[in-house]
């Protein structure tokens, strides 16, 4: 235990720099039920940290934001130790989030797995859209694009991104489906989206229109 504490102390000591911000965190959660399964809304929108079985978990990690010249960087590592998350009574340790996000002016470059919700929706109230929700663990991917609205005209802004990634559920499918049944391994992931915004910046009324595409391929 001494080594992690010492390392954390060193990182926190360096967070006093004007351009750096360190954010350590720890979280504990548990869900129990008396019926056949956990109620739907106690499982939904949990970014994969929910289960129809009784479950408990502890998670912790470290976020780091800093600047390097005109570049802005954000890194994060988030790990989870859980019981009953995938199968009844099973024990698992996994990485929930691990990513680096780099921004230069309007350009964004991202690599890793990060929790995200559906665009244009209030993810605290919604169960997701037709292609994306907050019900599964993040998908590792590499992305490039314009992550925030960029005004190209006084009342017209654009944003968009494209990414490629891969699913990490091979072992889950092997245990869930079992031998003698068909299932696909090593599936790849592709995402792209584009949006336009019409309206006065920071005005009371703005119109957002766009399209998203999420696909599976390979395997």
Model region roles, listed by residue range:
Residues 37-43, 91-94, 121-128, 170-179, ...:
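Outer-membrane beta-barrel translocator domains and adjoining extracellular loop/strand segments
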Residues 52-60, 91-96, 135-142, 186-192:
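Residues that define the transmembrane beta-barrel architecture of outer-membrane proteins
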């Amino acid at each position: 235990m001494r080594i992690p504490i010492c390392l954390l102390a060193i990182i926190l000591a360096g967070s006093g720099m004007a351009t750096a911000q360190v954010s350590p965190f720890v979280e504990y959660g548990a869900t129990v039920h008396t019926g056949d399964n956990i109620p739907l809304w106690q499982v939904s929108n949990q970014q994969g940290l929910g289960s129809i079985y009784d479950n408990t978990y502890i998670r912790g990690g470290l976020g780091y934001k800093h600047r390097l010249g005109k570049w802005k960087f954000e890194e994060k590592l988030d790990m989870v130790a859980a019981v009953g998350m995938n199968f009844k009574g099973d024990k698992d340790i996994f990485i929930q989030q691990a990513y680096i996000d780099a921004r230069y002016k309007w350009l964004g470059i991202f690599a890793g797995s990060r929790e995200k919700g559906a665009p244009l929706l209030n993810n605290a109230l919604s169960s997701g859209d037709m292609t994306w929700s907050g019900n599964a663990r993040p998908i590792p991917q590499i992305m490039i694009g314009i992550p925030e609205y960029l005004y190209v005209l006084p009342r017209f802004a654009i944003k968009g991104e494209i990414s490629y990634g891969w699913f990490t559920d091979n072992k889950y499918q092997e245990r869930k489906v079992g031998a003698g049944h068909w299932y696909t391994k090593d599936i790849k992931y592709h995402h792209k989206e584009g949006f336009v915004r019409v309206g006065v910046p920071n005005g009371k009324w703005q119109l957002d229109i766009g399209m998203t595409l999420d696909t599976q391929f390979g395997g």
